[in-house]
Amino acid sequence: MHLTRRDCFRWGSAALATAGLSACATHPMPNAQTVNAAGTGFQRKRLGAATITAVSDGVARRPLDASFVRNIPLAQVQATLAAQQLPTTHIDVPYTCYVIEAQGKRYLLDTGFADNGGPGTGLLHTHLQAAGIAPASIDTIILSHLHGDHINGLRRKNGELVYPQATVYVAQPEMAFWGDDARMQAAPEAARGGFQNVRRVFNGYPQDKLKLFVPGTRIDGVIDTVPAFGHTPGHTMLAIGSGKERFTFLGDTTNYPYLFVRHPSWHVMFDMSPEQAATTRQAQLARLAQEGSWVGGFHFPLPGFGRLQTRSEGFDWLT
C-alpha cells in the first residue's frame, strides 16, 4: 500500500494516540465492560481440541466527538448508539487480547499496554493470572499490527521485556513499513510517534525471539494469518479451527463493534488508509457472517466471542 504525504497528515494524530492512550482517553473504566458476568476479566471457550481465552487489558473512556468517525455526521453516530441503548457522549473502548492453547503451546494475540497506558488499562497480567495462565507460560505472541495499544505490552516503561521467554511474530509488510527509517524521517512530525514507539519496543529485542511472517501463511501449523490491510499496511487477522467451529481474531479490522460492525463503511479515526480499511472490513465481515463462525476483536468487550448476523446494512455481533 502506498501512503501519500496527505495520508500521513490524516493519520498522524491517530499514530500518536495509539502509541499510548490519547489525551482524552484518561477516565477510569466502567466495570460493565471490563469483566465478564463472573467479574473475572476473562472468558474461556473450547473450540475442538483448542482452548481460547478472551482476556481484558482494560477499558478506556474517550469523549465522543466528530473526529471519531471521520465520514459520518456526529448526530448520526449518536443516533446509532442511542438505538442500542448505549451512551452518546462518550465511547468506552475495550482492549481485549486472546490466549489460544493448542498443540501443547500457548499463543497470545496482541499484548495491550503493560504500564504504558492510561488509567483503566494494563490489566492483562492480573486477568491472565485470574484465568490460571501464568504470563511466563506464554510460548508465542502474534501481533495483528504495530499500533501502540497492541505492542506496548511487550516492554515496560523501564525497558524491561514483559515476555522474555516468548517468540514474537510480526507481519513482514507491517515491520517493513514501521521499521523504515527513511519513511519515518519523511513523515510530518505529528506522524512520527508511531514509528518512534515501534523502535522503543523492538530496538534491542533478542533476535532469536523475533520472527516475521507473510500474511496468508500458517504459524506453527496452528494459527492462520489472514491479510486484512487498510487499518495499517500489514494489518493481519488471526484464526484457528474450521467451519462454524473456527475462531477469527479481527484485531482492528473493526474498532468499536456497535459502530463499525453495524456500519462497515464508516471510517474510524485510527484507520491509516480509510477506504481500503472499509473495503477490507465489509469483505471480511460478510465472509465471516456467511461462515457462521466465532468472531472476536481487540476492541470488542467481554465475553469476547460472538457470531455475526447480517442486517439490511452491515452486521450485528451476537454473543
Predicted regions and their residues:
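Conserved beta-strand hairpin/beta-sheet module of binuclear metal-dependent hydrolase folds
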Residues: 42-131, 237-254
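Cap/insert and terminal regions of metallo-dependent hydrolase folds
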Residues: 3-4, 243-319
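Active-site metal-binding loops of divalent metal-dependent hydrolases
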Residues: 57-58, 111-113, 146, 173-174, ...
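C-terminal segment of N-terminal export signals and the immediately downstream linker at the start
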Residues: 23-54
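N-terminal export signals
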Residues: 1-2, 7-30
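Metallo-beta-lactamase
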Residues: 122, 129, 133, 137, ...
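Active-site metal-binding motif and surrounding structural segment of the metallo-beta-lactamase
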Residues: 97, 119-169
